């Protein structure tokens, strides 16, 4: 089973690909989709095109993305929501189901504490996946954490 975790944003989208083979969880790929500081609709187009390429290449059984966390910064929440829409559209156009997880669920699964700081999530995901150091930027570590949490949520590692 192959799963892609996505941490959406308009400047950086973290992508993490995990695959279960012979009872082992393997990190297949991780990367950041970055966009230059241009008009938002052009950024979203770049995100869509690059994500669509990744979905076609990797052929995951499922995409996992965090539900929108509404913070005090409404502008940021709206931008993340727009990027999430691109993720959902790319997944739908490729007939890939989407699992949405709450940020607190991801943190609880990865660290054991739903309000863990970002640094703890990065540290734990590196340890859990056998990486020497946490992937950078942190959006990529978050994407791997989202994919890992998706596996556990679906019973993929049991």
Swiss-Prot record:
Domain of life (superkingdom): Bacteria
Any Gene Ontology biological process: DNA repair
CDD domains recorded: RuvC (cd16962)
Location of this chain's protein in the cell: Cytoplasm
SUPFAM superfamilies: Ribonuclease H-like (SSF53098)
Main location, first listed in the record: cytoplasm
GO molecular function annotations of the record: crossover junction DNA endonuclease activity; DNA binding; magnesium ion binding
Pfam families in the cross-refs: RuvC
Protein family: Belongs to the RuvC family.
Name of the protein in question: Crossover junction endodeoxyribonuclease RuvC
């Amino acid at each position: 089973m192959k799963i892609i975790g996505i941490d959406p944003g308009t400047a950086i989208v973290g992508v993490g690909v995990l695959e279960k083979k012979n009872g082992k969880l393997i990190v297949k790929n991780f990367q950041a989709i970055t966009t230059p500081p241009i008009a938002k609709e052009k950024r979203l187009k770049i995100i869509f095109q690059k994500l669509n390429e990744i979905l076609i290449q990797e052929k995951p059984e499922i995409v996992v993305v965090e539900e929108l966390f509404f913070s005090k910064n409404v502008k940021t929440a709206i931008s993340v929501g727009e990027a999430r829409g691109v993720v959902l559209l790319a997944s739908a156009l490729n007939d890939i189901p989407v699992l949405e997880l709450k940020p607190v669920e991801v943190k609880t699964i990865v660290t054991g504490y739903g309000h863990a700081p970002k640094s703890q999530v990065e540290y734990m995901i590196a340890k859990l996946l056998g990486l020497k150091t946490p992937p950078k930027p942190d959006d990529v570590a978050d994407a791997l954490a989202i994919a890992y949490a998706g596996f556990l949520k679906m019973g993929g590692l049991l």
